[in-house]
A protein has these predicted regions:
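Conserved SGNH/GDSL esterase-like catalytic core that processes O-acyl groups on lipids
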Residues: 27-113, 140-143
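Positively charged n-region of N-terminal signal peptides that target proteins for export
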Residues: 1-4
Protein backbone atom coordinates (compact mmCIF):
# COMPACT_ATOMS: atom_id res chain seq x y z
CA UNK A 1 0.00 0.00 0.00
CA UNK A 2 1.38 3.39 -0.94
CA UNK A 3 1.48 5.71 2.04
CA UNK A 4 0.02 9.16 1.61
CA UNK A 5 1.89 11.89 3.39
CA UNK A 6 1.72 15.64 3.65
CA UNK A 7 4.30 17.23 5.97
CA UNK A 8 3.29 19.75 8.60
CA UNK A 9 5.29 22.81 9.46
CA UNK A 10 7.58 22.13 12.40
CA UNK A 11 6.80 24.40 15.30
CA UNK A 12 8.88 24.30 18.46
CA UNK A 13 6.53 23.46 21.31
CA UNK A 14 6.70 22.03 24.76
CA UNK A 15 5.05 18.64 24.89
CA UNK A 16 2.53 19.44 27.59
CA UNK A 17 1.72 22.92 28.90
CA UNK A 18 -1.05 23.72 31.37
CA UNK A 19 -2.74 27.10 31.75
CA UNK A 20 -5.39 28.75 33.93
CA UNK A 21 -4.91 27.33 37.41
CA UNK A 22 -7.81 28.34 39.68
CA UNK A 23 -7.41 31.09 42.26
CA UNK A 24 -7.11 30.03 45.89
CA UNK A 25 -10.46 29.38 47.54
CA UNK A 26 -12.39 29.07 44.30
CA UNK A 27 -13.87 25.92 42.83
CA UNK A 28 -11.46 24.35 40.34
CA UNK A 29 -12.15 24.90 36.67
CA UNK A 30 -13.07 22.01 34.42
CA UNK A 31 -9.99 20.38 32.92
CA UNK A 32 -9.56 20.09 29.15
CA UNK A 33 -6.64 18.36 27.41
CA UNK A 34 -5.95 19.37 23.80
CA UNK A 35 -3.97 17.03 21.55
CA UNK A 36 -2.76 18.53 18.30
CA UNK A 37 -0.03 18.77 15.69
CA UNK A 38 1.54 21.91 14.23
CA UNK A 39 -1.83 23.11 12.92
CA UNK A 40 -3.00 23.54 16.51
CA UNK A 41 0.26 25.31 17.39
CA UNK A 42 -1.50 28.67 17.25
CA UNK A 43 -2.98 27.77 20.63
CA UNK A 44 0.47 28.19 22.17
CA UNK A 45 2.18 30.90 20.11
CA UNK A 46 -0.81 33.26 19.87
CA UNK A 47 -1.72 34.67 23.29
CA UNK A 48 -5.15 35.75 22.06
CA UNK A 49 -6.09 32.20 21.05
CA UNK A 50 -4.78 30.88 24.35
CA UNK A 51 -6.76 33.49 26.29
CA UNK A 52 -9.97 32.48 24.54
CA UNK A 53 -9.47 28.78 25.28
CA UNK A 54 -8.49 29.21 28.91
CA UNK A 55 -11.46 31.42 29.78
CA UNK A 56 -13.29 29.24 32.28
CA UNK A 57 -11.19 26.12 31.77
CA UNK A 58 -7.95 24.60 33.02
CA UNK A 59 -6.33 23.61 29.75
CA UNK A 60 -3.42 21.28 29.09
CA UNK A 61 -1.96 21.80 25.62
CA UNK A 62 -0.22 18.68 24.32
CA UNK A 63 0.90 19.71 20.84
CA UNK A 64 3.60 18.08 18.73
CA UNK A 65 4.85 19.19 15.31
CA UNK A 66 4.41 16.34 12.81
CA UNK A 67 2.37 14.43 15.38
CA UNK A 68 0.26 11.42 14.40
CA UNK A 69 -2.64 9.53 15.91
CA UNK A 70 -1.14 6.09 16.62
CA UNK A 71 2.31 6.15 15.01
CA UNK A 72 5.44 8.11 16.00
CA UNK A 73 5.66 11.52 14.35
CA UNK A 74 7.32 12.41 11.08
CA UNK A 75 10.36 14.35 12.33
CA UNK A 76 13.56 13.27 14.09
CA UNK A 77 13.36 12.56 16.93
CA UNK A 78 9.75 11.52 16.34
CA UNK A 79 7.21 12.81 18.86
CA UNK A 80 5.01 10.17 20.51
CA UNK A 81 1.59 9.53 19.04
CA UNK A 82 -1.65 10.66 20.65
CA UNK A 83 -2.24 7.05 21.69
CA UNK A 84 1.15 6.87 23.40
CA UNK A 85 0.59 10.21 25.15
CA UNK A 86 -2.75 9.03 26.50
CA UNK A 87 -1.03 5.93 27.88
CA UNK A 88 1.73 8.03 29.46
CA UNK A 89 -0.60 10.63 30.97
CA UNK A 90 -3.01 8.09 32.41
CA UNK A 91 -5.54 9.73 34.73
CA UNK A 92 -3.84 13.09 34.24
CA UNK A 93 -5.75 13.39 30.97
CA UNK A 94 -8.66 15.73 31.57
CA UNK A 95 -12.22 14.39 31.53
CA UNK A 96 -12.70 16.48 28.38
CA UNK A 97 -10.35 16.01 25.42
CA UNK A 98 -10.04 17.96 22.17
CA UNK A 99 -8.27 16.29 19.21
CA UNK A 100 -6.92 18.03 16.11
CA UNK A 101 -4.58 15.48 14.56
CA UNK A 102 -4.45 13.82 11.15
CA UNK A 103 -2.56 16.03 8.73
CA UNK A 104 0.45 13.69 8.89
CA UNK A 105 -1.49 10.41 8.95
CA UNK A 106 -2.25 7.74 6.38
CA UNK A 107 -6.07 7.42 6.22
CA UNK A 108 -5.96 3.62 6.44
CA UNK A 109 -3.81 3.67 9.58
CA UNK A 110 -5.99 6.43 11.03
CA UNK A 111 -9.08 4.28 10.48
CA UNK A 112 -7.41 1.31 12.14
CA UNK A 113 -6.34 3.38 15.15
CA UNK A 114 -9.15 5.77 16.02
CA UNK A 115 -11.19 3.25 18.04
CA UNK A 116 -8.02 2.18 19.85
CA UNK A 117 -7.39 5.79 20.89
CA UNK A 118 -10.98 6.34 22.02
CA UNK A 119 -10.94 3.13 24.08
CA UNK A 120 -7.69 4.21 25.72
CA UNK A 121 -9.20 7.60 26.60
CA UNK A 122 -12.36 6.03 27.99
CA UNK A 123 -10.35 3.65 30.18
CA UNK A 124 -8.56 6.64 31.69
CA UNK A 125 -11.71 8.45 32.70
CA UNK A 126 -12.30 10.68 29.69
CA UNK A 127 -15.99 11.54 29.43
CA UNK A 128 -16.14 13.82 26.39
CA UNK A 129 -13.99 13.87 23.24
CA UNK A 130 -14.37 16.78 20.83
CA UNK A 131 -12.76 15.67 17.56
CA UNK A 132 -12.12 18.27 14.86
CA UNK A 133 -12.30 17.48 11.17
CA UNK A 134 -9.41 18.49 8.91
CA UNK A 135 -9.36 21.11 6.21
CA UNK A 136 -10.10 18.87 3.24
CA UNK A 137 -7.68 20.42 0.76
CA UNK A 138 -6.93 17.00 -0.76
CA UNK A 139 -8.34 13.47 -0.94
CA UNK A 140 -6.20 12.27 1.98
CA UNK A 141 -7.84 14.69 4.38
CA UNK A 142 -11.30 14.04 2.97
CA UNK A 143 -10.84 10.34 3.70
CA UNK A 144 -9.70 11.07 7.26
CA UNK A 145 -12.78 13.24 7.79
CA UNK A 146 -14.93 10.30 6.72
CA UNK A 147 -13.14 8.16 9.31
CA UNK A 148 -13.83 10.76 12.00
CA UNK A 149 -17.54 10.94 11.19
CA UNK A 150 -17.76 7.16 11.07
CA UNK A 151 -16.19 6.85 14.51
CA UNK A 152 -18.64 9.34 16.00
CA UNK A 153 -21.52 7.05 15.01
CA UNK A 154 -19.91 4.20 16.97
CA UNK A 155 -19.01 6.32 19.99
CA UNK A 156 -22.20 8.26 20.68
CA UNK A 157 -22.13 9.73 24.15
CA UNK A 158 -18.34 10.00 24.18
CA UNK A 159 -17.30 11.58 20.89
CA UNK A 160 -18.58 14.80 19.31
CA UNK A 161 -17.41 15.93 15.87
CA UNK A 162 -16.50 19.58 15.47
CA UNK A 163 -16.65 20.18 11.72
CA UNK A 164 -13.78 22.62 11.33
CA UNK A 165 -13.70 21.85 7.61
CA UNK A 166 -17.22 23.24 7.14
CA UNK A 167 -16.90 26.02 9.71
CA UNK A 168 -13.76 27.43 8.08
CA UNK A 169 -14.92 27.14 4.47
CA UNK A 170 -14.68 30.43 2.58
CA UNK A 171 -12.23 32.01 5.05
CA UNK A 172 -8.92 31.99 3.19
CA UNK A 173 -7.57 34.69 5.51
CA UNK A 174 -7.62 32.26 8.41
CA UNK A 175 -4.87 30.17 6.82
CA UNK A 176 -1.31 30.24 5.58
CA UNK A 177 -0.60 29.66 1.89
CA UNK A 178 -0.97 25.87 2.27
CA UNK A 179 -4.62 26.28 3.31
CA UNK A 180 -4.01 24.19 6.43
CA UNK A 181 -1.81 25.97 8.97
CA UNK A 182 -3.39 28.90 10.74
CA UNK A 183 -2.80 32.61 10.52
CA UNK A 184 -3.11 34.64 13.71
CA UNK A 185 -6.74 35.36 12.85
CA UNK A 186 -7.37 31.70 12.08
CA UNK A 187 -5.92 30.62 15.41
CA UNK A 188 -8.31 32.91 17.24
CA UNK A 189 -11.27 31.72 15.17
CA UNK A 190 -10.43 28.08 15.87
CA UNK A 191 -10.13 28.87 19.58
CA UNK A 192 -13.51 30.63 19.54
CA UNK A 193 -15.09 27.65 17.77
CA UNK A 194 -13.76 25.16 20.32
CA UNK A 195 -14.51 27.37 23.33
CA UNK A 196 -18.05 28.10 22.17
CA UNK A 197 -18.68 24.35 21.85
CA UNK A 198 -17.29 23.68 25.33
CA UNK A 199 -19.66 26.28 26.78
CA UNK A 200 -22.64 24.95 24.86
CA UNK A 201 -21.96 21.43 26.16
CA UNK A 202 -21.55 22.59 29.77
CA UNK A 203 -17.84 21.75 29.76
CA UNK A 204 -16.71 25.24 30.76
CA UNK A 205 -16.53 26.91 34.14
CA UNK A 206 -16.10 25.46 37.65
CA UNK A 207 -16.25 21.73 38.17
CA UNK A 208 -19.93 20.98 38.93
CA UNK A 209 -20.72 19.53 42.36
CA UNK A 210 -21.43 15.80 42.56
CA UNK A 211 -25.00 14.89 41.67
Amino acid sequence: MRRLFVPSLAVALCCSVAYAAPAAGKAPLQHVTIFGDSVAAAFTWDPRARTVLTEGNRVTFDLSPCGRLTEPGCITPPPPSVFKKVELLGRRVGPTVVVLVGYNDDPHIYRAGIDKVLRAMQRRGVEHVLWLTLRAVNKQYLLINQVIHGASARWRGLMTVLDWNSFSRGHAGWFASDGIHLSALGGVQLAIYVHRTLKRMGLNGPVPPPA
